[in-house]
Amino acid sequence: MNKDIFLTNNLNNKKEKFVPINKENIGMYVCGPTVYDNPHIGNARPLVIFDILFKVLKSKYGHDKINYIRNITDVDDKIIKSAKEKNLSISELTNNVIKDFNDDCNYLNLDNPSQQPKATDHIDLMIKMISTLIEKDFAYVVNDHVYFEVSKFDDYGKLSNKKLEDLIAGSRVEVSDNKKKSEDFVLWKPSKDDEPSWDSPWGKGRPGWHLECSAMSKKYLGNVFDIHGGGIDLIFPHHENEIAQSRCANDSKVFANYWIHNAFITMSNEKMAKSTGNILKIKDFKDNVDGQVLKLALMSAHYKQPLDWNEKLLEDCKNTIDKWYEVYLPPKDKIVLDEDILSPLYDDLNTPGYIAKLHQLYDKALKGGNEEKSLFVLACNFIGILNKTKEEWIEFKKKKSSINEDDILEMISLRNKAREDKNYKEADIIRNKLLDKGVLIEDKDGKTIWKLK
């Protein structure tokens, strides 16, 4: 496609035309989960947003031209703490959470990334990078710890657009007598006897969190690549530290050219976070909410804006998809999406704009023929919506309904009998009972038809 892609780049907080380093091999790195607990809806937002970006890049440059890396952090203080609390080994915990995470991604109908590397498979690369930073005098060793010396990197704070002293004052900085200055951050630290550890030139220990992404992005994408993404909470200190250690280790003036960050999901205008217990886990929705409903809800606000999560949002999205399935028709192979349809997504991933476009296409499909219906469904499929057949959608609604089909038909029969007897009060009571159980009825051409809400 000839249309340009525009993205808001947090390096300068401006919307810029996306120009890849090499359009034959575009690199995108997104910070994935730290697998100490199951993902919640707040974690799902970047998964969905960067899946959309992955799809957009593939649509423009080709499916085999995008190298999308989404890492898994499987060594971390939170993991150690969680494993002890749950009386599990580290490997048992991380393997369980990784499996659940992958199941959640399938539930949301996300495209698989090109690679999903685990931190523990790349410890040797991290040790090598630390050694390089020490040799170049950007890092120092104290009591089996290795720290990055922030004052030696002049561009520190550029991504956050803040001075160093402001960043330190406004964040929780690890306090340690080993550091030269409070802003220095750990690259390697010793492990206790019951904690995961690896041999290194500085003794048995494990890497700092920030180093993991620098080592893995270097392996899979090189010293400089196109896009780095994650939640807005990662800008500082995680992404700021990544930039510092990567540029210093690699002697590069750039780490990633475009930095994309999504805003938080809130509940009652408070950030959703595991640390506060203010969370809704993805797995808790699976029995009662179809994944595409959840996905549409996550796309209902622009990724740069906070999204307040509530039951009405979910209900509205379910009703929208229910309506859209009324015109469902498997898309024809020859039909393609033109640039005009995809234009909102090319403009800084404007998902609300794309959803508005889908409503327009639905109206045309409702009045048009098979070609209009196929085009509408294809446009929905592009973002992973209407990916199930109409029969599968109805079957899911039946499973979660508190009433079976035989009971529905029996109640409709009783209602029809009440209407024949002119007992309209009783007929209304039965209608309302069905409605309470999620069943809508309509009298049409002398018959009563029903559908699940």
Curated annotation (Swiss-Prot):
Q: Which keywords, in A-to-Z order, does the entry hold?
A: Aminoacyl-tRNA synthetase, ATP-binding, Cytoplasm, Ligase, Metal-binding, Nucleotide-binding, Protein biosynthesis, Zinc
| Species | Pelagibacter ubique (strain HTCC1062)
NCBIfam families, sorted: cysS
Q: Where in the cell is it found?
A: Cytoplasm
Could you say which residues bind Zn(2+) here? C31, C213, H238, E242
Q: What class of enzyme is it?
A: ligase
User: Subunit notes for this chain?
Assistant: Monomer.
Could you tell me one molecular function GO term of this UniProt entry? zinc ion binding
Annotated motif 'KMSKS' region, positions = 271-275
Name the family the entry cites.
Belongs to the class-I aminoacyl-tRNA synthetase family.
Q: Which InterPro entries match?
A: Cys-tRNA-ligase (IPR015803), Cys-tRNA/MSH_ligase (IPR024909), Rossmann-like_a/b/a_fold (IPR014729), tRNA-synt_1_cat_dom (IPR032678), tRNAsynth_Ia_anticodon-bd (IPR009080)
Give the record's GO CC terms.
cytosol
Give the cofactor note text: Binds 1 zinc ion per subunit.
Catalytic reaction annotation:
tRNA(Cys) + L-cysteine + ATP = L-cysteinyl-tRNA(Cys) + AMP + diphosphate
Q: What is its EC number?
A: 6.1.1.16
UniProt KW Protein transport keyword: no
* UniProt record, GO biological process: cysteinyl-tRNA aminoacylation
- Name its co-factor(s): Zn(2+)
Protein name per Swiss-Prot or TrEMBL: Cysteine--tRNA ligase
Q: Where does ATP bind?
A: K274
> Looking at the record's lineage, which domain of life comes first?
Bacteria
List the ranges annotated as motif 'HIGH' region. 33-43
Q: What is its main location?
A: cytoplasm
